[in-house]
Amino acid sequence: MAATLWAFFSVLLLLLSRDAQSSEVSGSTSDGSGGSGVGTGDRFKIEGRAVVPGVKPQDWISAARVLVDGEEHVGFLKTDGSFVVHDIPSGSYVVEVISPAYRFDPVRVDITSKGKMRARYVNYIKTSEVVRLPYPLQMKSSGPPSYFIKRESWGWTDFLMNPMVMMMVLPLLIFVLLPKVVNTSDPDMRREMEQSMNMLNSNHELPDVSEFMTRLFSSKSSDKSSSGSSKTGKSGAGKRR
């Protein structure tokens, strides 16, 4: 009789110890998952909300999807714009909201082994720059996507900056403005200009630039002298009268 009672109590104690161990294991798993990334075992969930300013969620959520690391994990949006992607192990993931009508910036989410979530912007240019984001995610649209490049409008600056036009206009401006800037009455200056232009004119089939410059300057000087003589003649005739 005593042996049976002892066996009964031993079995009862064994069952109670197993129940206590199972409750401790379940409590440790629930404490280790942590925060908003609660999951079963080593699996967690990413949750957030997508917003398009000035547009109701019902007008665009039907064609939108939530992608985690491409198409490794896919989630759907609820009627209020919120989403939850389940069964995600610990690691770093890029979360994107894909919509044909609106553009959303991707977000990187880091999940620790204890279930802690850290979110930040994805910067492909400056990878070392870290901009923290609140969690759960609040993903706001930056506007409609631009699938086409606008055609550039034609302007006068495009015509003037054309290399062919500049090649024709610049020499003309030089020949017109240079005689006005340089003192053509100085023979030494004229001689130096003729020599420099002859050095550039290496092809003998082309017209001589020095002759052109001499004719240009001589014609202007002759015009000045003729105008001066005509003025003196008129003044002399007036005095005689």
Curated annotation (Swiss-Prot):
Membrane association type: Single-pass type I membrane protein
Location in or out of the cell: Endoplasmic reticulum membrane
Biased composition (Low complexity): 218-234
Protein purpose: Part of the endoplasmic reticulum membrane protein complex (EMC) that enables the energy-independent insertion into endoplasmic reticulum membranes of newly synthesized membrane proteins. Preferentially accommodates proteins with transmembrane domains that are weakly hydrophobic or contain destabilizing features such as charged and aromatic residues. Involved in the cotranslational insertion of multi-pass membrane proteins in which stop-transfer membrane-anchor sequences become ER membrane spanning helices.
The name this protein goes by in its record: Endoplasmic reticulum membrane protein complex subunit 7
Subunit composition and interactions: Component of the ER membrane protein complex (EMC).
Organism in which the protein naturally occurs: Bos taurus
GO molecular function: carbohydrate binding
One of the protein's GO biological processes: protein insertion into ER membrane by stop-transfer membrane-anchor sequence
Transmembrane portions of the chain: 159-179
Family per record: Belongs to the EMC7 family.
